[in-house]
């Protein structure tokens, strides 16, 4: 389950196969959208909550209120079913969409005030390697750090346009 600002998503996987996912970017609050979205996802996939082996949730970074609502919902469902629950960095999760990219993955989320939430990753032999911890960093500081990497750099996330417009990278 991922909740950030107005965006929310839920996905259901079996082994590594995506069975279904829901995404919304509405004006409704997270408390109004999350549980109906999860219920509809389970219904469409014909899966009962009791059949789920493990639940994962976004651990941020992101909006404190949105993360708190997502965590409370997932932990509540997991507790009720005695199901293990794991947290996933939102920044790391973004990188799993690009397992074939051979350069530097630079997920960025707008943290406001000229900063982005960021971490750096790269794939090596089928494994995602974390090069930096999740952090809040100014765009000029990130730009300076990225100059040290000779390989292609891919910006991804809701802060990518902001960074692209601000940075002077080759």
Regions found by a protein language model. Name each.
Residues 3-59:
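N-terminal beta-alpha supersecondary unit
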Residues 17, 84-170:
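Surface "functional belts" at beta-alpha junctions
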Residues 25-33, 64-68, 72, 89:
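Residues at secondary-structure transition points
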Residues 38, 73-77, 94-98:
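Buried hydrophobic packing segments
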Residues 56-85:
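DPxDG-like acidic metal-binding loop motif
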Residues 43-50, 78-88:
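Phosphate-handling active-site elements
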